[in-house]
Structures are given as C-alpha cells and as structure tokens.
Design a protein with these regions (language model features):
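Conserved PLP cofactor-binding pocket of PLP-dependent enzymes
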Residues: 191
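Conserved PLP-enzyme active-site core in the AAT-like
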Residues: 1-183, 188
Length: 191
C-alpha cells in the first residue's frame, strides 16, 4: 500500500544496492517496532536495526491514514529517522515536521503545482544537519529545478488552499454518493 514509483525505487534499485527493505503495516505498531528494532524476520536475519522508516501520511492507492507522531516515535526510539511523504495531504492540511518527522517529501507535480505543467518534488528537513546531507546529495546528483519550473510551483501554491478545500468538498460528495450506491462494494475515503 505505497505509491508504485516508490515501490519500484525501493525494490528495483535500493535492494540491488544492498539496502534492506522491509515492508510493514504502519498501523500495526508492534510489527513496526519489531521491524525497526531489527527483531523481525528480515531485520533480525541481518542483525541490524533500521536506519530509516519511510511512510505516506495517506497511502497510495488505498488512502490508509498513518499517525505521524506514533510512527516517528517508534523510529526515534530505535535511532532511525522518519521520512514522510505528505503529497496527498499537502502542507496546507498537515505539517509532519511538527509531528516528529525528520524529512518530509512532496511530489510538487501533484497538488502543490496543481496544473500538470511541472515535474518536481521537494524535500523539507527538520534541522541543519539533515539539510546539509540533502544538499550534498542534491549538489552531486544535480536534482535542481530550473527557475521557470520553480515559478510554476510558486504560482500553484498561491491557489493551493482554494483547490484543496474544493477537492475535499468534491471528495465528500462523491464518496457519500458512492457509499449509498447498490453496485459499489467499497469506498476508500479517509474523511
């Protein structure tokens, strides 16, 4: 229950590079704690605790709601950092850094820019040390957005509140309709 592009990145690249990826239901705090501590089957077999816990505030595609404070707390208890994808929720509705996340990522292509004219992402960090580490990687790898694309994201953010409010209204109306429709078996709506 994670965005397909992220799933592919983890399993097609990171694992090839020797990174151990363990998938855990992030609403099952006992299983998550075991995985992060290195006591689960996959982590324990390698005898190493996790260095990071990655999760989405609202998962893609099933919209499972994750508790940032609880998950970040488990990560921190074992010395791991909490990396949160806040794309679906946006900073308009939630600020995961205020809830204990160490790194927050957004696909700016989606809600932030909002007009399907930019391919962009952003990384927000809780402190200078993490910021320096992200900058170092960005500087070496070249993942820097051009000025025109930056301006497109800026323009999109100006209408973010209006668009998010309307999208929430529409989602409520559509899900209410679908919940009562006799041919619909299930509706994934977190609101």
């Amino acid at each position: 229950n994670i965005y397909g592009g992220t799933y592919s990145l983890f399993h097609e690249y990171f694992e090839r590079w020797g990174v151990i990826i363990e998938e855990v239901d992030t609403t099952d705090y006992e299983a998550l704690d075991a995985a992060v501590s290195g006591e689960s089957v996959k982590g324990g077999a390698h005898g190493c605790p996790a260095k990071a816990v990655y999760f989405e505030v609202l998962t893609n595609p099933l919209l499972q709601v994750n508790n940032v404070t609880a998950i970040a707390g488990i990560a921190h208890r074992h010395g791991a950092i909490a990396i949160v994808d806040n794309t679906f929720v946006t900073p308009y509705l939630q600020q995961p850094l205020d809830q204990g996340a160490d790194i927050v990522i957004h696909s700016a292509t989606k809600y932030l820019a909002g007009h399907s004219e930019v391919n962009a992402g952003l990384v927000v960090v809780k402190d200078d040390e993490l910021g320096k580490r992200v900058y170092f990687a960005q500087n070496r790898l070249g993942g820097v957005l051009a000025p025109n694309e930056c301006d497109s994201v800026r323009r999109g953010i100006q209408t973010l509140a209006l668009r998010m409010d309307r999208q929430q209204e529409n989602a409520r109306a559509i899900s209410s309709y679908l919940l009562l429709h006799p041919l619909v078996k299930s509706v994934h709506y977190p609101g």
